[in-house]
Amino acid sequence: MKISVTGATGFVGKALVADLLSKACEVNALVRQSSSELPLSVTQLVVGDLALDDSFSFLREVFSGVEVVVHTAARVHMMNDDSSVPLTEFRKVNRDVTLVLARLASELGVKRFVFLSSIKVNGEITRASHPFTPDD
């Protein structure tokens, strides 16, 4: 099976890539910066920043011919966020880019798009007595 993974050097992404490779999957790894953390056996390594390249043209090659896209790339909480408008940046990367990726995957005939969200998806408070609903 041929799978593209965004955020392939992130906390979840690199574990996922290792697991997929151990199962003999072909993996296209999309990373923001080149890194030695990825195994050499990935099928394709593509360096690109989803937050900066609004054309997403480089993704056509990454998504072409794959059966599954697993989107793990995200802007996660950082204690020293240097953005002047962090909420806007979170929404751009975690919401807007995700929508573009899902649409592109659909356009290219990708059979499955798997989205792993970030820890902040439901806000700041998790109450054990109140499960999250679609309205939260």
Predicted features along the sequence, with ranges:
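N-terminal Rossmann NAD(P)H-binding glycine-rich loop of SDR-like oxidoreductase domains
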Residues: 1-23
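SDR active-site strand-loop-helix element
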Residues: 6, 30, 69-75, 113-119
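Conserved glycine-rich Rossmann-like NAD(P)H-binding loop of the short-chain dehydrogenase/reductase
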Residues: 25-33
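NAD(P)H-binding glycine-rich loop region in Rossmannoid oxidoreductase-like domains
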Residues: 36-39, 43, 47-96, 100, ...
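Phosphate-coordinating loops and pocket residues in cytosolic domains that bind phosphorylated ligands
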Residues: 92, 115, 134
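Catalytic loop of short-chain dehydrogenase/reductase
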Residues: 130-136
